[in-house]
Amino acid sequence: YFSIFSMTNKLFEKKTFTSFDKNYSAEIFIKKPDKYKDIENYSLAAENLITMGSGFSFAAASFKKDNLSISFEKFNRVINFDKENKSITVEGGMKFYDLLNFTLEHKLWIPQIPGYPLISIAGAVATNAHGKSCGFHGTIRNLIKKITIFHRDQGWLNLSENENKEIFDLTIGGFGLTGTIIDITFRLVDFEGFSFNTSIEKSHSAIDTVKKIQDNTNSENFVYSWNRTDQKNNFGNGFIFQNKINLETKSEKVKKIKKTKFIYNKKLFFLN
């Protein structure tokens, strides 16, 4: 159903949202703009506003009861791509699987990929996300060249190492508190291979897991673990997965990343 948002004369849909960890639900007002002018209007009109990415934060990071959340799912376009200089500018609502499906066609990518393909690019910037090779590649900050944000008091701001650097640093990992992330320019890196050799090793504890992962952080290998947290006597036991790029296997064909659906099972007690 629809309700009139108390601070404007516009119609805003009211929906119930639940956090990814299933611990919090709330009725919120939501709008999905498709024009830059709408971003300005909604930001100025609402007293309490939160920018929403894909909504996959474990906590309720992008919504609160009776507040207005602006979803950026329609801002999902490639604005500029420079293959020669390995640079791309995308809107913040673009999903990771869309970004990779585009860049991998040109044998380019960003390795700091969160664990789910539907996470938004702006959401990854707002949390300074990392991938499965973070010991080697670091966080997504290492490949960000520029950011455009909109702030209700300061207006449109361009951020980089050379322009508004302090706000640039605060925006990456700032959970949107410096303003709404509109678009991001990345430095891309070469993608070395399209096949991987995967190994699985048993881990006996959380400490054992940390040690084994640290031993593999000085390479481009993807290393991650699944650890049980529901057993007091065997806390942290699980498995370590390692994916090594197979440079001997060459393929000119890029397999598209599918839009998958995550099925949440509340009975699982794994940390990834």
Question: Predicted segments — roles?
Answer:
Residues 8-30, 260-272:
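Intrinsically disordered, low-complexity segments enriched in small residues
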Residues 21-115, 128-133:
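Glycine-rich N-terminal segment of FAD-binding domains in flavoprotein oxidoreductases
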Residues 43, 61-62, 80-83, 119, ...:
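Solvent-exposed alpha-helices and their adjacent loops that cap or buttress functional pockets
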Residues 59-77, 133-154, 180-187:
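Structural signature of FAD isoalloxazine-binding scaffolds in flavoprotein oxidoreductases
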Residues 126, 145-272:
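C-terminal substrate-binding/cap subdomain adjacent to the FAD-binding core in PCMH-type
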